Regions:
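Formylglycine-dependent sulfatase
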Residues: 1-167
Length: 167
């Protein structure tokens, strides 16, 4: 029986204001792929972050809960492994799940690997970095739990890995 479930892709960007993209009228920044998403997807024109700091906001995106509910009120607090994440929900619905890119939900262990298991919050496939601001050949943890280096500019390497995973 064929699998008719659509692929779902969530893009979490650091430091991205709603006004800093081409489809919002920003001429100095070229964002053709985001502009294409905007033409065919949904644009939320009135969105508010409960806590616009990396870790707490990522925790909200992953769990659907507020930072005060998850306890992630500042950076470098680990997301509790008993939290229900989108990784768990999609996995329970029969999806293969993957997380590729910056995680920042495993506490202050910035360069340390995020090992396979509950700290990956239900994601089956993993190529993530708990925290990194190097952006060029920075470290990440591979699916087996080993530290690796992205090849070249992180965003491009992560995008390439995501495309390969989706194929």
């Amino acid at each position: 029986m064929p699998n008719n479930k659509p692929n779902l892709l969530f893009v979490f960007a650091d430091q991205l204001r709603a006004s800093s993209v081409g489809y919002a009228g920003e001429e100095a920044v070229r964002t053709p792929n985001l502009d294409a998403f905007a033409r065919t997807g949904t644009i939320y024109k009135n969105a508010v972050s409960m806590l616009p700091v990396c870790g707490p906001f990522r925790g909200s995106l992953i769990t659907g809960r507020t930072p005060t509910s998850t306890g992630l009120v500042i950076n470098d607090i680990p997301l509790r492994t008993d939290e229900i994440s989108i990784g768990h929900c999609f996995k329970d619905a029969g999806y293969d799940t993957a997380y590729i890119g910056k995680w920042h939900l495993d506490g202050p262990n910035r360069p340390a690997p995020v090992p396979p298991g509950p700290r990956r919050q239900g994601f089956d496939y993993w190529m993530g970095a708990n925290f990194e601001h190097n952006y060029d050949r920075s470290q990440f943890t591979d699916n087996a739990g080993h530290l690796q280096m992205w090849e070249g500019w992180d965003a491009q390497a992560q995008t390439s890995h995501t495309i390969e995973y989706l194929k």
